[in-house]
Amino acid sequence: MLGWCEAIARNPHRIPNTTRTPETSGDVADASQTSTLNEKSPGRSASRSSNISKASSPTTGTAPRSQSRLSVCPSTQDICRICHCEGDEESPLITPCRCTGTLRFVHQSCLHQWIKSSDTRCCELCKYDFIMETKLKPLRKWEKLQMTTSERRKIFCSVTFHVIAVTCVVWSLYVLIDRTAEEIKQGNDNGVLEWPFWTKLVVVAIGFTGGLVFMYVQCKVYVQLWRRLKAYNRVIFVQNCPDTANKLEKNFPCNVNTEIKDAVVVPVPQTGSNTLPTAEGAPPEVIPV
């Protein structure tokens, strides 16, 4: 017996299988099974971790959709077609032309500025002539016409050239007419007019005609500038188009009626009295004293 114990102490790995308890063997088997499962399923753990990370961050995929929906949803309020702003009490929206939809509304001030800059009195889309009340400002309150530097330079050069050209034409005509008159007097004395007289007469006629054409073209440009200046310094009040105003008045009561029909009346119970209503024709209750 003592020899067997000494052998076990010297070499414990050579213990027979019969001496081991079933509990220890079962624990070892469970540990081996768990280790093999962990080794065989690394992909499952990775997929589970990825699914958990996706579930923990749900806003990453839905945030752009909500933003796109907000940007796509149209506004139901009426806006100005020039500045794309809503109307208020100080600057209400008007319907000056026959355009429909979102293009029919415009601010009075925006339309006034557009008419002043474009110098037109009709809508550029439906070609409807605006119903306007115009009034010029006093000369003291007139403002300068808004022009670029190139336009101002062109106007200054054209005016200077026009003045010089008119002076030259007038002077040349005066000299030619004076010389022609002297030659006519000499021809009357001699009785014969020489060919230089007819040449000067043709030159005078051509110069006079060219001067008239040049003055007509330049005066036309000046008239256009004058009209622009007058249009810029006038007060304009545009009225609503009667056709669109009547349509809006017809649609307004229809909308009100539909809103009234859609409304639901909810009865509110009376909480002040806890007594129940008595039946009609029932005798009054007699309370004994």
Curated annotation (Swiss-Prot):
It is found in: Cytoplasmic vesicle membrane; Late endosome membrane; Early endosome membrane; Golgi apparatus, trans-Golgi network membrane. Pathway: Protein modification; protein ubiquitination. A zinc finger (RING-CH-type) spans 72-133. The chain crosses the membrane at residues 155-175, 197-217. It is a multi-pass membrane protein. One of its GO terms (cellular component) is plasma membrane. Residues 1-66 are annotated as: Responsible for low stability. Has a short half-life. Instability/short half-life permits rapid changes that allow efficient induction of antigen presentation once antigen presenting cells, APCs, receive maturation signals. Small changes in protein levels significantly alter the cell surface display of MHC class II proteins. Residues 59-69 have a biased composition (Polar residues). The RING-CH-type zinc finger domain is required for E3 ligase activity. E3 ubiquitin-protein ligase that mediates ubiquitination of TFRC, CD86, FAS and MHC class II proteins, such as HLA-DR alpha and beta, and promotes their subsequent endocytosis and sorting to lysosomes via multivesicular bodies. By constitutively ubiquitinating MHC class II proteins in immature dendritic cells, down-regulates their cell surface localization thus sequestering them in the intracellular endosomal system. Also regulates insulin sensitivity by controlling surface expression of the insulin receptor subunit beta/INSR by direct ubiquitination and degradation. This is E3 ubiquitin-protein ligase MARCHF1. It comes from Mus musculus. The lineage of its organism: Eukaryota, Metazoa, Chordata, Craniata, Vertebrata. The gene is Marchf1.
